Regions:
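Conserved MFS/SLC helix-loop-helix module at the cytosolic interface between two early adjacent transmembrane helices
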Residues: 62-98
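Helix-loop-helix hairpin linking two adjacent transmembrane segments in secondary transporters
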Residues: 141, 145-189
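Cytoplasmic helix-loop-helix junction between adjacent transmembrane helices
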Residues: 106-144
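Juxtamembrane intracellular "pre-TM" segments in multi-pass secondary transporters
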Residues: 2-4, 190-222, 247
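Extracytoplasmic gate region of multi-pass secondary transporters
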Residues: 29-30, 216-272, 331, 335, ...
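Extracellular/periplasmic helix-loop-helix junction of adjacent transmembrane segments
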Residues: 32-62
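Extracytoplasmic
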Residues: 10-42, 236-241
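Helix-breaking motifs and short loop linkers at transmembrane-helix boundaries and internal kinks
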Residues: 75, 96-102, 130, 310-311
Length: 409
């Protein structure tokens, strides 16, 4: 099946499901706090809830760089399957947690196991697709992430009727069963190394290859370009339901789905539109992917102000649509942009470092906004994140210039 002309799209469909579970399992907890704090009193403090969210991100971020290196050197099929099974087992186990410390340890293990997926999954898709379809393929895969984020928003709704414990147990079982499906249908692809005649020397030595990657100035611009928008990105994922519940004075069981569905549907549209636009623009301009991502980032700027200070349902839905659509356009082009600068046998490693930078930014902002919530400044601090997006947008447009000849197809 892996040699079939259509398998490149089959693998996108298979990994769409993994991406969905990856985000749904981590995101459910962000809307189930009201239900969980009845049984686990420590969660009544936003600062403690911030710690619970942040430990996942710190472990996930620390592991991401190593997971990319691992994915470039072993079977990505088995890495993906193992990662999915372990984090699903952790989700299942969270249904039996009785103390804050147990949840804390399980979230740390989840961060470790989930970190193994994204670099492996994206590099596998990038290898199966050429420049003509790469952004669209990545975009479809990323839409699985947004779908998972949306379904995660229903965690509070499901837990309201079936308990938060049973919610974790159910979705943990689903993930473990899906891992069995992947054993049957998922295939790996042999990685190609760009010929030296095209100007790129294969790095057979691990340390020299890593030094070559980390010594590249454009790579660090990409890292910055990826990390800074992660501040508002993770702020939205982890704290927007709380902000909207407070601003609109509605229950979290309503605010959770309202927030995540609005952002996720618009993000899904953004990755598809951004993917198609990027693939076509790239055929006539080597900076087409960069410009597409920049347009997406620009849309998040007014969205953050509106999200921070909005007090009506219209404000919230409008800001969620703008942010989701723009972030989707940005998100679908990160791996394709990386492919313009990094050899195929280093793509997972490169994306792993990007993920590490983005996650560490997310951990910082998640912890900070927990304290901001307790201090009553959540809305203002949300709006202030727009300024950092403006700065990185300018840096990206000035300094990120791909090779005139694309050799990393």
């Amino acid at each position: 099946m892996s040699t079939s002309k259509n398998y490149k799209w089959i693998i996108v469909a298979l990994l769409f499901g993994v991406a969905l579970l990856n985000y749904m399992d981590r995101q459910m907890i962000s809307t189930m706090r009201p239900a969980m704090q009845i049984d686990i009193a420590e969660l009544k403090q936003a600062t403690n809830f911030g710690r619970l969210m942040a430990i996942f991100l710190w472990v996930y971020g620390a592991m991401s760089a190593f997971s990319g290196i691992i994915a470039d050197r072993i079977s990505r099929k088995w890495l993906i399957i193992g990662s999915l099974f372990v984090w699903s087992a952790v989700t299942f186990s969270m249904g039996y947690a009785e103390t804050f410390n147990q949840l804390y340890v399980l979230r740390a293990i989840m961060g470790f196991s989930e970190a193994l997926y994204i670099p492996a999954g994206l590099s596998l898709i990038a290898d199966f697709h050429t420049d003509k379809t790469r952004s669209l393929a990545i975009g479809i895969h990323m839409s699985g992430i947004y779908m998972g984020q949306a379904l995660g928003g229903f965690g509070s709704t499901v837990s309201k009727y079936y308990s938060w414990q049973n919610t974790f147990i159910l979705f943990g079982l689903i993930g473990m069963l899906y891992a069995m499906v992947l054993i049957l249908f998922l295939r790996d692809k042999k990685r190609e190394i760009t010929p030296a005649s095209l100007g790129y020397q294969p790095n057979k030595n691990f340390f020299s290859g890593l030094a070559s990657l980390l010594g590249s100035f454009p790579f660090w611009i990409i890292v910055l370009y990826f990390a800074v928008p992660s501040l508002p990105g993770w702020a939205i994922k982890n704290w927007a339901p709380t902000l909207i519940a407070e601003n609109l004075k509605i229950d979290m069981s309503v605010a959770g789905p309202l927030t995540t569905i609005s952002i996720s549907i618009s993000s899904l549209l953004g990755v598809i539109v951004g993917g198609i636009l990027s693939d076509r623009w790239f055929q006539v301009n080597s900076r087409g992917r960069i410009y597409t991502g920049a347009i997406g980032l620009a849309l998040t700027i007014p969205a953050l102000f509106l999200m921070g200070y909005g007090v009506t349902v219209f404000h919230i839905i409008a800001s969620a649509f703008l942010f989701g659509f723009g972030f989707g356009m940005f998100d679908t082009n990160n791996m394709p942009i990386l492919c313009q600068f990094v050899q195929p046998n280093q793509r997972a490693t490169g994306y792993g470092f990007l993920n590490t930078a983005g996650i560490f930014a997310g951990a910082l902002i998640t912890d900070y906004l927990g304290k901001s919530t307790d201090a009553g400044n959540l809305g203002k601090d949300f709006a202030m994140l727009a300024f950092v997006v403006v700065i990185v947008l300018i840096i990206q447009l000035i300094f990120l210039k791909p090779p005139k000849t694309n050799v990393l197809s």
